[in-house]
Amino acid sequence: MALLQISEPGLSAAPHQRRLAAGIDLGTTNSLVATVRSGQAETLADEQGHHLLPSVVRYQAGGHIVGAEAREQAADDPLNTVSSIKRMMGRSLADVQARYPHLPYQMHASESGMPQLATAAGSVNPIQVSADILAALSARAQAALGGELDGVVITVPAYFDDAQRQGTKDAARLAGLHVLRLLNEPTAAAIAYGLDSAQEGVIAVYDLGGGTFDISILRLSRGVFEVLATGGDSALGGDDFDHLLADWLREQAGLRDRSDAGLARRFLDAAVAAKIALSTQQETTVCVGDWQGEVSRDQLDALIAPLVKRTLLACHRTLKDAGVTRDEVLEVVMVGGSTRVPLVRTQVGDFFGRQPLTTIDPDRVVAIGAAIQADILVGNKPDADMLLLDVIPLSLGLETMGGLVEKVIPRNTTIPVARAQEFTTFKDGQTAMMIHVLQGERELVQDNRSLARFTLRGIPPLSAGGAHIRVTFQVDADGLLSVTAMEKSTGVQAAIQVKPSYGLSEDEIVGMLKDSMANAEGDLSARMLAEQKVEAARVLESLHGALQQDSALLGEQELAAIRQAQTALQAAADGDETSAIEAAIKVLDAQTQEFAARRMDSSIRRALAGHSVDEV
């Protein structure tokens, strides 16, 4: 999808100037930054060659440090070393303390209730800590790319609410970054594998990180990823594998005393190294101090099998919440370093009945997907198959009587946006209305692009114009259009979602704009003619009903004169002269004014019949 710099056809500026963009995976345990270079998405390493940046910040009186160095000092300076700050994003202090009662920090609430952490550098909040991590990633990207970033895409969990998403945006702005978009982490992983241009269907994203497990069920339809359901376990991750193995190793070494924190740390480090080794070999040797032992993959599998089973139970629940079966899942994407464990891959494959996608480094797949999206959104791929827009390139509207288009959202409107208009029924007793959604700049339906049709049923059977239908067009930040039609008195409604940009190239957009300019005068004339034809039909329909009901109120000559004007209007409406139709409507209006007055008097007399003046 190319983010277009919308301009008038033929006036696009600097078409070959490449912009610098990055994708950022702002993780709970580790963060990464990636970019697209020479057509390939890749994560960027620091000067030591490390791609993962630990999401840890240590605050000191003279400043702060971010990453591995900060993490190494966490044990010695826990009050000033902040980690897993993502868990606090968008939450109140009370919520944080209820969820995580054993945090080592000294915290108090700000005026807005946000947690404030007391450090040697002063009080900091989750937004500021996240901004420091983002700034470190930004500096890495700018050093690698040789210039300032034009924009970034930052990933967030699919379950993040508005407050958490806004907090992430605020952190990015504080770090001096221009946020092109927040992208759901499972969607980013799917994009990294190119699933956004694949066949339509259900995709599962299994994300097992160091401290958390998330399962997301997505549906891909016409280029749109819809999150059907999310689930998981916020207290289950690869760290739990490490602790189980470390405890087992201590038992093998005959060391059950846990009072020596340094020794416990060495066993934990040894467990991590063993777990990594067993991902590629059947057994490995473990050395801690004077003790040496062996551990096999089978032994590790036996230890962690109950935890892996817990993740699969969460998958089962989330599939049920999504209303889909395992057989409906087309692809399973593996995310998170802990999915390298062979037992995890095997069990997940058996559960879903298909081989999971694992060819992209699971630690990096989310950042890579974000980088691909950022490269598109910043405008470096104008010929991409998909199209995401920060403005609407072509007007969106709906069909009205006479084959006309009523524009609801004009082109070049910034998104996200929502607009609404009210419409009424055309005929007496009308109980349904067809909503035809269109895209384009022309005046007539036939000259525009049809996006979708749906029907609003259950409209009360009132006289023409009596029912009021409010039609709302809403386009979100990803260009997804939702159209909702609601009858105001009953609240009955119908809706549809569509991707206006799906399957539409920049050349086609430009072509449609040029057509609208070239045909502007003719289109306006055609619209005026169609509008007069619709008005003529409305007048004739109304007159037909009135004559059927109250023609006895007219004398023979009066009725003949009205019939003559009625026939003349019908003849004019069958022709193509706008002025002739307009004139015929005026003649018929003049002929029926007295008839309308008599009908009003008759209606009042019928309403008052049988009632006294006092009752009135």
From Swiss-Prot:
Disulfide bonds: none annotated. It comes from the Bacteria. This is Chaperone protein HscA. It comes from Edwardsiella ictaluri (strain 93-146). The keyword Metal-binding does not apply. It holds the Pfam family HSP70. InterPro entries: ATPase_NBD (IPR043129), Heat_shock_70_CS (IPR018181), HscA_NBD (IPR042039), HSP70_C_sf (IPR029048), HSP70_peptide-bd_sf (IPR029047), Hsp_70_fam (IPR013126), ISC_FeS_clus_asmbl_HscA (IPR010236). Keywords: ATP-binding, Chaperone, Nucleotide-binding. GO terms for biological process: iron-sulfur cluster assembly. Chaperone involved in the maturation of iron-sulfur cluster-containing proteins. Has a low intrinsic ATPase activity which is markedly stimulated by HscB. Involved in the maturation of IscU. The keyword RNA-binding does not apply. GO terms for molecular function: ATP binding; ATP hydrolysis activity; ATP-dependent protein folding chaperone; unfolded protein binding. Belongs to the heat shock protein 70 family. Signal peptide: none annotated.
